[in-house]
Amino acid sequence: VKALFFDRFGGPEVLRYGALPDQALDAGSVLVETSAVGLNFADIYRRQGVYLLEGKAPWIGGYEGVGRIVAVGTGVDRWRIGQRVGFLDVPRAHAARVCAPADRLVALPDDVDDRTAAALLLQGVTAQYLVEDSGRLAAGDQVLVQAASGGVGRLLTQMAAALGAEVHALASTPSKREQARSNGASAVYGYDDWVAQVRRATGDGVDVVYDSIGTTLHDSLAALRPGGRVVIFGKAGGTPPAIDPLSLMEQSKGVVGGDLWTYLNRAESRQSRADRLFAALRAGMITAPVITTFPLSEGAVAHRLLEDRNFAGKIVLIPDGLR
């Protein structure tokens, strides 16, 4: 199978494109011929060796994609050859063919094209669980979204605003702050003295802070009102600092960890979350990102672009020959 792979950790230069042995089709799995696969920051962290990878080199990155089923393993009843499917938690996705456990596939609506689905599934369902499960947002809540112009942050802002929450957004540049405002943020801030600005704007702080940076955990807690909570779901800036539990007790503040795989644990859950995500897109509650495509063989170029913090939008890799 043609794939984008690496056999050592490092920068984009370690990525190679070529043929690797086909993966065996296990019982309970299907073989998907991909038409579009998403590129996410987690793929960069895996390439760098920051995130743990199973098995031995060579490793194929990617977790999210869209395609059609070309083979069905024994014990699979729900899916058939030729069916169009998506997935958001299937490893080794950056390849022309992917072996996927049958319970990790989702059926896709006809009105959402392959590239949009591949661009939206993982980040969209992530934002969805952060709003519904970890944050448990309600209309009238005041929330702060860090990195609000990023892939998840953009959707978080849109979903929270559609729910009726008052969204305060952090973004690093004037253009990104303008993007956050256009996505529904009521107030936007840069990263200079943002805690004081948020507290002045809200009176005594926000109800929920979505922290994807990690190193900002102490500041996130300081931006909360008494009884508020930080949902920490990333460490883009580095490892979060230690916190004293007694400091949380004094104002009844809390820190909630956010990890998608806690909630994405059943086939029915995957499908219902995907259905609700695409319904939100159809209703205009959220919008698809600006999509930049590269051939799978140019994956190293795509990785370099994604690592550029000035990049906005979503990168989708297209198997060679399908552009």
How would you name each of these model-derived features?
Residues 93-96, 171-179, 240-245:
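Short, glycine/polar-rich helix-capping loops at beta-to-alpha or helix-loop-helix junctions
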Residues 145, 161-216:
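Adenosine-nucleotide cofactor-binding segment
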Residues 216-286, 318-323:
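Glycine-rich phosphate-binding loop and adjacent beta-alpha segment
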Residues 84, 142, 166, 228-229, ...:
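Short glycine-centered segments of the SAM/dcSAM-binding site in methyltransferase folds
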Residues 153-154:
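N-terminal Rossmann-fold NAD(P) dinucleotide-binding loop
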